[in-house]
Amino acid sequence: DIDGTLTTASGRIDARAFELLPDWDAPIVFATGKSFPYPVALAQFLGRPELVIAENGGVVHVDGETTVVGDPTAPRAVVEAFRGRGGDPIWGPEDTVNRWRETEVAVSLDADESLLRAAAAGADDVAVVDTGYAYHVKSTGVSKGRALKRVAGALDIDLGAFVAIGDSENYASTFAVAGESYALANADDTARDAADAVTSASYMDGTAGVLADLRNRSE
């Protein structure tokens, strides 16, 4: 995960990510609810291969190939229905949050959640996921866990060899398929319940602790 996992409480990338990740001697998959350019840019700035799961599993990039898994038609229709009921996604006319999204729509946490969920309830196969940073309106068939299976297959790595670290409900599907899973102390209840363990520290403090333990075990 990126937000809440490689960041500080204020949302900035923690400097320790640039110390710990560039030379990590195993594949690193950057998984996020953000649109595709964000994790690709992070991988590039860290000098890591572009192994990316974006939009909560809607876009996958592995071995130089990008696959768009989700269909944005139904999520976009839900947001239009939300607007029709008087709802406002809040982001404003420029809306850089959604500008590059290909499979889902993100709505601000300041928006009317109950109205948004009511609009989604009237659609087939659409879910609203609260990541703690936005409400993500997406297809029910899209998840980070399914995307990780796709990445693992492309890399020919057993799913049991993956260690997942995250902080919100959109990571529960990943925790269900990875060999080891850690919810950070700042994680929501869904992530905590799905993880194998919950760290005592929050944000990058917790992530750094997991990485230190993994390194110690490999020596």
Residue ranges of predicted features:
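Active-site phosphate-binding/coordination module
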Residues: G11-N98
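Short, well-ordered beta-strand core segments
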Residues: I28, V52, S181-A183, V198
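Short glycine-/acidic-enriched loop or helix-start segments at secondary-structure transitions
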Residues: A9, P39-A41, D63-G64, T174, ...
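Conserved acidic, metal-coordinating active-site core of Asp-based
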Residues: R85-A178, Y182, N186, T190-R192
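Asp-based, Mg2+/Mn2+-dependent phosphohydrolase catalytic module
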Residues: A185-E219
